[in-house]
UniProtKB/Swiss-Prot annotation:
One of its GO terms (cellular component) is extracellular region. Expressed by the venom gland. This is U33-theraphotoxin-Cg1a. It is found in: Secreted. It comes from the Eukaryota. Residues 93-108 have a biased composition (Basic and acidic residues). It comes from Chilobrachys guangxiensis (Chinese earth tiger tarantula). Belongs to the neurotoxin 32 family.
Length: 124
């Protein structure tokens, strides 16, 4: 029975892993996954939208795009991060989501991470 549940779980993980996000169109081009469309209103590249990667830890970020789905200067944060006011003058930066820290990641059992890696490998 446990084996059947493990097989079902692996198949479910594979199905979700293969689902693709709807690509973002930016300046007539499709952005890669984990990116957004930014249209700077200042300096070089003014008014030409371009694809940029989602924010990483401590990168500047934005929360909401305009009505066309375009961000004015920075992408939102990548997975596991949230756009949070940090320091003075309260600039928005990508920070670990509350409740998550390196220690909590380290304290997770190795069985869980091994199972996840096995699932990824079996997806092809």
């Amino acid at each position: 029975m446990k084996f059947a549940v493990a097989i079902a779980f692996t198949l479910l993980v594979c199905v979700f892993a293969q689902e693709e996000e709807e690509p973002v169109t930016c300046g007539g081009k499709q952005c890669k996954p984990n990116s957004c469309c930014v249209q700077n209103s200042h300096g070089k590249g003014k008014d030409s939208p371009r694809c940029h990667p989602l924010g990483k830890l401590n990168n500047p970020c934005e929360v909401e795009p305009n009505e066309n789905g375009i961000y004015s200067q920075h992408c939102p944060c990548g997975e596991g991060l949230s756009c949070t006011k940090v320091g003075e003058p309260n600039k928005l930066r990508c920070q670990e989501e509350s409740g998550k820290s390196d220690k909590s990641k380290e304290s997770q059992g190795s069985d869980e991470s091994e199972e996840s890696e096995e699932s990824k490998e079996s997806c092809g």
